[in-house]
Amino acid sequence: MEYKDTLLMPKTDFPMRGNLPNKEPEWQAKWEEEKLYEKIQEKNAGRKAYILHDGPPYANGELHMGHALNKTIKDIIVRYKSMAGFSSPYVPGWDTHGLPIETAIAKKGVKRKEMSIAEFRKLCAEYAMTQVDGQRTGFKRLGINGDWENPYITLLPEYEAEQIKVFGEMAKKGYIYKGKKPVYWSPSSESALAEAEIEYQDKTSASIFVAFKVTDGKGVLDEGTNIVIWTTTPWTIPANMGITVNPDLDYVVIESAGEKYVVAEALLPSLREKLGFEDATVVKTVRGSELDRVVTKHPFYDRDSLVMNGEHATAEAGTGAVHTAPGHGEDDFLIGKKYDLEILAPLDDRGVFTEEAPGFEGVFYDTANKMVTEKLEEVGALLKMEFITHSYPHDWRTKKPVIFRATAQWFASIDAFRDDLLAAVKGVNWTPAWGETRLFNMVRDRGDWVISRQRAWGVPLPIFYAENGEAIITDETINHISELFREHGSNVWFERDVKDLLPAGFTHPGSPNGEFTKETDIMDVWFDSGSSHQAVLNARPELSRPADLYMEGSDQYRGWFNSSLTTAVAITGEAPYRNVLSHGFALDGEGRKMSKSLGNTLLPGKVIKQLGADIVRLWVASVDYQADVRVSDEILKQVSEVYRKIRNTMRFLLGNINDFNPTTNGVSYENLREVDKYMLIKLNDLVKNVKDSYEAFEFSTIYHQINNFCTVELSQFYMDFAKDVVYIEAADSHDRRAMQTVFYEAVVTLTKLLAPILPHTTEEVWNSLIGEGAESIHLQDLPDVKVLADSEEITAKWDAFMQIRDNVQKALEFARNEKLIGKSMLAKVTLYVDGEAKTLFDSLEGDFAQLFIVSDFELVEGLENAPESAFKSNQVAVQITVAEGETCERCRVVKKDVGVNPKHPTLCGRCADIVVKHYEA
């Protein structure tokens, strides 16, 4: 007889190697064929809804690790909720308008000027949809479960129709108006540019220090005192309307050569030499806040220049007092509006001065730099001029410098409902908590929202103009345009004449002759995605507003979180979300931003081909995503190692229950041994902790909890000593069936707990466990937390035992290193105990040699009896010696009774009994 044939070795069809790159697409095809997404929705129909609303990625370019991080977090949440008693549909979306798509079309060599706007827009739409298709394939390959056949896409007619309604409702409430605001303007292209069309290059500019004389010091400064400003754009001096100082900085009045000057105290040391103030004396110090509304005179025009308080004035460079031209700068404009200054931008589209800048009419702005400095010198206001090289914005097409220039734009007034916005922010639950402060401060401090863009590819502003120039936005026109867009798409705006866009028979007092024109600007793309609560949450029957969760990168506080909040509060009075969760950015292994120039980009598509989607997903679960996260080949290697441990644990469990039927072979809890109960209690604790962590979106905690359970509780303890039972004992022995009961519970529980994170691997485990015709793991619910008898008492006892077991393991390791023993199975452990440890061992039941994975065990009372050589630590001493006896051929345990049965001279008594009873015919 071959004794090895009497061993009950593990058997499973679950392979050791995951082969994920090849296996995952097979599962995905099966899920699609079986309509798994729809089945999950059917299973959860009627349950409480939990709606995670997808922030739309931009439909341009290959998916990067940021996409993978974002979509995987969302998918884990939705899968968790779907297994936790909620109905949690997931509708993915895409943001499809805007400049990058126009640029991509231009790069293909399309001659934009040789076609109509409508034709150009059709090319943009086609390009956007191919990008959507490419990204959709990538997201599906990542294992993201959602309604991929019916996503929301911002260019679809039904979406645009709802966006028009949002605009109309805001206009109806008086929140939409036309005004002036500075934008990047390219004189060389004669057009406004978005930030994406700007590139920075070095440019040499005149750097000048200019004195503005005080005419009304408000009791703080004497008349005739000079406030000194610094600028690198002398050409903007003709548009100067004010000076900005920081309210929280200290400024000094100094006297030099009979003149008084005001500069920031912190900058005085550097300015003494630069401006020849070496001998200047400090007359007084004033706070920036005290200078608010002091009046100075423009250096060469007969008008006032008002001193204002603004945070953007700093003591980092210059003088601490900032020349302010509201028509030529973002900060200048915002503070100019706050102080009600004229928004003067005396340049035409080509960058040439108009008659609004007397003395410079018809001069190109760059040429005017020299003329302005000469004029300042002539009037005695120029204190210093030098040349500096600095990084300056250029038009990425023409490579020529751009300017800030105020032009007429459409705005959404934030002031009109700012208090409602702030109250809404306070009513939302933010994770991380700092998100609330961040958005609250942003909303509190933000100016009005410029919603118009002078571009072609976007949703048209649905505005008509009467003969007298009056803008027409009425319920009638808005509803009509909304329905036109719903039927034909927004291209109809560019394809039809005005009369064919207006409702039949439309009249307006401002157009006595019945003539109208239409707006040519489009909406800011943030208005597109910011309307999704109306176009998706409110419009789709399976969804609802407000959503339970918005979850995006931390850059979306100023983006989608902000625009969505603005439009939702404007039209509904409440936030579109109950909870907001944000994640950081994906950086390389050294914490650097990924970029092609650094050559450190890692693309999810490539990683999935090499390692599989479940490895990418496990990486996402392993990181503290609320901060910036790192990813590299080395980090993914570490994650793969954890995956391997989890997979091996599953394989061991599956292999050792191949002859186990839970219905007929399962052992009830009360009939289990204490050590088996202890493992089920630990498993139950894991269920509670993991479910709590899912609920708190703390996936890295789950990663560590499950990894720890598989590695420590199972691999290093229970599964290790179990081999002496499940391989060796008779198939139907009580102890073997008890351990198989625990194994079965463990594999079922772990598979369910891991399903949201590792959807492919857990499906494979589940199919191996249940067999042919198994219903998907993703149609199961998460395990419940059970109430197990005597759990506290059993846990306390066995936790204490595990600490002692650690000491025994250390002693065995020491003995191996000292060559006292080879394998631990050759050892005898003698344990010397006192006090609590003695009481503990008296109360424990079990085969301690088996539990310590040694051949022999002896318990001796009295630490004082331990020999010098014993390994000592709190309350116990461990002596390791070589076990006496022979090694049993079947179980490999060293026993004194080997050969007790003469028919089986190489077997111990236990093995001989098993063989005789169960294997001898």
UniProtKB/Swiss-Prot annotation:
Record-listed ATP binding positions: 596
SUPFAM superfamilies: Anticodon-binding domain of a subclass of class I aminoacyl-tRNA synthetases, Nucleotidylyl transferase, ValRS/IleRS/LeuRS editing domain
EC number: 6.1.1.5
Residue ranges of the motif 'HIGH' region: 57-67
Origin: domain of life: Bacteria
Pfam families listed in its UniProt record: Anticodon_1 (PF08264), tRNA-synt_1 (PF00133), zf-FPG_IleRS (PF06827)
Family matches, as InterPro entries: aa-tRNA-synth_I_CS, aa-tRNA-synth_Ia, Anticodon_Ile_BEm, Ile-tRNA-ligase, Ile-tRNA-ligase_type1, Ile-tRNA_ligase, M/V/L/I-tRNA-synth_anticd-bd, Rossmann-like_a/b/a_fold
Subunit structure: Monomer.
This protein's domain notes: IleRS has two distinct active sites: one for aminoacylation and one for editing. The misactivated valine is translocated from the active site to the editing site, which sterically excludes the correctly activated isoleucine. The single editing site contains two valyl binding pockets, one specific for each substrate (Val-AMP or Val-tRNA(Ile)).
Protein name per Swiss-Prot or TrEMBL: Isoleucine--tRNA ligase
Species of provenance: Listeria innocua serovar 6a (strain ATCC BAA-680 / CLIP 11262)
Originating gene: ileS
